UniProtKB/Swiss-Prot annotation:
Segments crossing the lipid bilayer: none
Quaternary structure annotation from Swiss-Prot or TrEMBL: Homotrimer. Binds to both RNA-binding sites in the C-terminal region of Rne and to RhlB.
Major localisation: cytoplasm
GO cellular component, one term: cytoplasm
Entry similarity comment: Belongs to the RraA family.
Pfam annotation, one family: RraA-like
Protein's GO biological process: regulation of RNA metabolic process
UniProt KW Cytoplasm keyword: yes
HAMAP family per UniProt: RraA
Protein known as: Regulator of ribonuclease activity A
Secretion signal span: none
Gene that this polypeptide is encoded by: rraA
Source organism: Photobacterium profundum (strain SS9)
């Protein structure tokens, strides 16, 4: 499904939070949305693999990577796993790598930067907790919508018809 965050803000501005502009688009899908699952991890992506093995229809993985620009939390293998399990998208307060490969996958990916260095694999982090970045607190099961213009958050699904 296509989402237009500008139009959604025109209709629902009093009901949504707008995340501070900081993200770049890396996936093959330019807009996406769904109910969020949160992960908080720093320079370690083993937990992401575990979460992304779950069915992802209608879901977006929101990753609080502490804004790290030193190690990529998302690489081509993790993004492919998300695509295979039908996740709608990934929003990463952190970095990605293998950007040419990410562009070929049918998934939306928003992150703050790219870097060629991969993440650790220790499995350190938390799932389904409240996280805060970009001027917004994200709660598990909130709904998020993203496109090339921006990212918005709503406690309820937005009617886009």
């Amino acid at each position: 499904m296509e989402y237009n965050t500008s139009e959604l803000c025109d209709i629902y501005l009093d009901q949504v939070d707008v995340i501070e502009p900081m993200f770049n688009s890396y996936g093959g899908r330019s807009s996406f949305g769904g109910q969020i699952t949160t992960v908080k991890c720093f320079e370690d992506n083993a937990l992401l693999r575990t979460v992304l093995q779950q069915p992802g229809v209608g879901r977006v993985l929101l990753v609080d990577g502490g804004g790290s620009l030193r190690r990529a939390l998302i690489d081509a293998d993790i993004a492919l796993l998300a695509t295979e399990n039908e996740w709608e998208g990934l929003i990463v307060y952190g970095s990605v790598r293998n950007v040419d490969d990410l562009d070929e996958l049918e998934i939306g990916i928003q992150a703050i930067a790219s870097i060629p260095v991969g993440a650790d694999q220790q499995g350190v982090g938390d799932v389904d907790i409240a996280v805060n970045f970009g001027g917004v607190t994200f709660l598990p099961e909130d709904h998020i919508y993203a496109d090339n213009t921006g990212v918005i958050l709503s406690p309820e699904p937005l009617d886009i018809e």
